Amino acid sequence: MKTNKILAIGLLAAATVLTTGCSDSFLEVENPTGEPLEDYYTTDEHIQEALIAAYDPLHWPDWGLGQYNALNIDGEIMGDNFWVGGATKTDMQNWHMLFNYEANENNTLGSLWTVDYSGIKRCNDLLKYLDWGTDVTEANRKLYEMQARLLRVFYYNMLWHYFGTVPFYLENLSEPPYTAPQYTADQVYAELIAELEAVIDSKVLPLKYYKTIKEGKEVDDEGQLGRVTQAMAYMVYAEMVMYQNDESRFSKALGYMKELIDSPSFRLNPSFANIWETEGEWCDESIWEINYEQTNNERGWGSPLAVGGTVLPTLISPNSFPGDDGWSKGNDGWGFMPMRLETYQMFSEQDKRRDVTCWVIAEDVEYTKRYQDTHIWLQKYRPYDKNFKQSSGDQNLNYNNNYRYYRYAETLLNAAELSLRTGGSGTGEAKTWLNEVRTRAGLAGLANVTVDDVLTERRLEFVGEGKRYFDLVRAEGISGASASNKATTALVPDEYGYRTNSWTAKKKYIPIAQGELDSDPALVQNAYK
């Protein structure tokens, strides 16, 4: 049973905003007692309620607000490792249209936009309430501030990756028409990277929170697992700098990666398979995870934003499955994100990651084959009975699989790439770091490492973790990337007739939803078509 419950609890102390449009309700905030906000948010306890509320939207993307937006699926469907699947081509039509680079204002990631702006709004609320806190120590005040600022960067980072040009504000809107200026992608990056550097330079956040052993059991004594940390900030920084191809900050990002590599707090889990087990959550390889909890859950189809588990395993498993040793007959999957055969075939037989990544179901096992079925599914987040057996809520919606967002393996591969791109030798530290990942996978080390080797290793290591598409896009700016690792040459029509359009630079930023355009006529749609 997992014990890290604090950050799986969603409080409603700070009311959410469910649109970024021009409406007075965007600013309405109520507190649990009905007393004036200035009087309520004065104590440390109440300030912490607002902080936990700022974390709450992290749990919403997989299902809520009318769309499924599991973060790894959103990050994989436009890439080259998976098909979209589902019942038909119109099941989650927005995913299918994004997959084929024909999305529009009515078929995009509309609810993800809302989730992220809800998180931003709650972070801004917390930062405002801190000014009212009279019963908060200065140390706690700084700790809460930096958590909120880093969370806010995280939410904006998702918006920046997908939409690029977005409304940007660091204080909630207080005057009609309650709209914010729309920044270009480069402007958003500049604002976020400066904010991120301020958080990092403050050195307020701990490098890591720890899972400890007590009475023979793993426990989280402080209830802190899931909070943002300095290490998580380093990973966001490297991710943003590399996606922007901001060479002026490569050395700084490399320094942050080296700090994590030199720290005794992080190491690769010796077992790649163990990472994906419940006991592997928050292991030494984990840098940051989003917690999902099967016990004490309140999440249901009528209350999708309540505390609970995740629907991800249901989404990505076969329909009407007859059962196996891990998942009983009668449980139901929905057939999204079947793995491409070519993805399975890219692993060598010696690669220990293959059978942990790929759930291959024998052809004689009968289940309801849905659209684009390949009999190969993502093993990392596949459903198991043990991951919902203590759930009191709707079963399909309450698996307890944490979402592994940043792993130490990514730190090593980030460092290898950044070293090479700042003039490092392919036989030096970059080789050491990349080969550490390969050795864990049971593969021979490389004698000389190139940037393209790192990109290829990233593909093998992170299948199904939502990173491949963004690697392909950013590799457009990497001179040493091969055709198989660049979006313009890898994301092209396939031989099966599923993808009929090619990726172009116009497809980097997806369309803004029509509802957002209607709520603010000043918003300019991305030039996607």
Model-found features: residue ranges?
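Short coil/turn linking the two alpha-helices of tandem helical-hairpin repeats
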Residues: M158-Y162, P167, Y243-E247, R421-G424
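Long, intrinsically disordered, low-complexity segments
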Residues: C22-S23, N81, D116-G119, A185, ...
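Conserved, well-structured interaction surfaces
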Residues: D44-I52, D56-G66, G85-F163, T179, ...
